[in-house]
Amino acid sequence: MSEAPKKRWYVVQAFSGFEGRVAQSLREHIKMHGMEELFGEVLVPTEEVVEMRAGQRRKSERKFFPGYVLVQMIMNDESWHLVRSVPRVMGFIGGTSDRPAPITDKEADAILNRLEKASEAPRPKTMFEAGEVVRVNDGPFADFNGTVEEVDYEKSRLKVSVSIFGRATPVELEFGQVEKLD
């Protein structure tokens, strides 16, 4: 007796900006065609990010892989055609056009772990690095430029070295109080 084929993760390319609709349409097509046994999860990996706008903390979602949808499925002709028939699907990534290759279990685990971590706490939308020059846009040091010395993502705070009267002075600021200089 042969073992049932295992569901593997495949990457489907969708029109950018339509990933959510493609995932929803795919779920509906699977149900409509009664092919639930061939499919597992359909994911658009996102993380919640926080940004400061006009002094307000705003949460939004950012896609890990814009333009891509992850589909857990058993690949055969029927499942391949079902995915390809969904509107705004451009095709599979990896392998050949008629025989797509799944991502490795290691890659799938890394993505799923990243999703799990992303659901625990929102990340800042803007990432800062030590040595980067920023402009302070709020508080007593508004309109001063400074160099990032330390970044604390847990507390969403920065230590910025601001030049005041010719002396470098370390200042603790929140992410929303500074902006990157281009």
Swiss-Prot record:
It comes from Vibrio cholerae serotype O1 (strain ATCC 39315 / El Tor Inaba N16961). This is Transcription termination/antitermination protein NusG. GO terms for biological process: DNA-templated transcription termination; regulation of DNA-templated transcription elongation; transcription antitermination; transcription elongation-coupled chromatin remodeling. Residues 131-161 form the KOW domain. GO terms for cellular component: cytosol. PANTHER family: RHO-INTERACTING TRANSCRIPTION TERMINATION FACTOR NUSG, TRANSCRIPTION TERMINATION_ANTITERMINATION PROTEIN NUSG. HAMAP family: NusG. The keyword Membrane does not apply. Coiled coil: none annotated. Participates in transcription elongation, termination and antitermination. Keywords: Transcription, Transcription antitermination, Transcription regulation, Transcription termination. Belongs to the NusG family.
